[in-house]
Amino acid sequence: MQEIQKNTKKEQYNLNKLQKRLRRNVGEAIADFNMIEEGDRIMVCLSGGKDSYTMLEILRNLQQSAPINFSLVAVNLDQKQPGFPEHILPAYLEPLGVEYKIVEENTYGIVKEKIPEGKTTCSLCSRLRRGILYRTATELGATKIALGHHRDDILQTLFLNMFYGGKMKGMPPKLMSDDGKHIVIRPLAYCREKDIVRFAEAKAFPIIPCNLCGSQPNLQRQVIADMLRDWDKRYPGRIETMFSAMQNVVPSHLCDTNLFDFKGITHGSEVVDGGDLAFDREEIPLQPAGWQPEEDDTSLEALRLDVIEVK
């Protein structure tokens, strides 16, 4: 009995620590990008997955202590996919006292009609879903639309665009919607997926499967996701360093003429961002930038990232 109580206390301690970290990550993202302002009405897009449940829970938590007032309304889109459990979200939200709206639109039927059997339906489905959510935001008087993409999603998108699209483009933490009428925010932008997975399991969220439509997953994104997970396992801190790099862009040391006026450089021009360090041996920090070992990560040793010495 004592052993059970001891385990329960430890689990609660770990959950509190995890929630505190997620809350800190979300709070920092909100502050850094001015995501939420006084009087905002936030439409929280709730799919029934681990990410959107976590986003709603952390925003509700922050709402109680934030120095500004803002309201939340959870919105779920019932796309009439076969087997969709309509009762789950109302049963979860009503006891919490969360305002919510279930929007019923048969996008599943439209997608099945337009996309050949066996092909990935995600692109068309997401466009239809986006339009419906924008319309719903207007109907509800929402000033912001919150999506549940996290740090790993942002990095995956960056590498997808670099590997397959030939451009350095990630997923913005805050943007103007396609119709030019709504501000979209991603409060989980600084949150690690593995933290969200652990939090969702500990909170026992009633997860709704994401593949009810039967669509095949995006294989390219899966390749990137597997690659990043492998890097994170073999080189602790590499993911944090790459995300930190997205926040420390040096246009003068890339090759985009739209970001930096290379043609304007003449004799006598000032040195920009250190000039040319390509021929100097740079000091590589033992601990990757942006990474701090956690209290419960005692099994991880600080590893130097692979460095190729150019002779």
Curated annotation (Swiss-Prot):
The gene is ttcA. Its EC number is 2.8.1.-. This is tRNA-cytidine(32) 2-sulfurtransferase. It is found in: Cytoplasm. Binds 1 [4Fe-4S] cluster per subunit. The cluster is chelated by three Cys residues, the fourth Fe has a free coordination site that may bind a sulfur atom transferred from the persulfide of IscS. It is an enzyme of class 2 (transferase). Catalyzes the ATP-dependent 2-thiolation of cytidine in position 32 of tRNA, to form 2-thiocytidine (s(2)C32). The sulfur atoms are provided by the cysteine/cysteine desulfurase (IscS) system. One of its GO terms (molecular function) is 4 iron, 4 sulfur cluster binding. Its main location: cytoplasm. Homodimer. [4Fe-4S] cluster binds at C122, C125, C213.
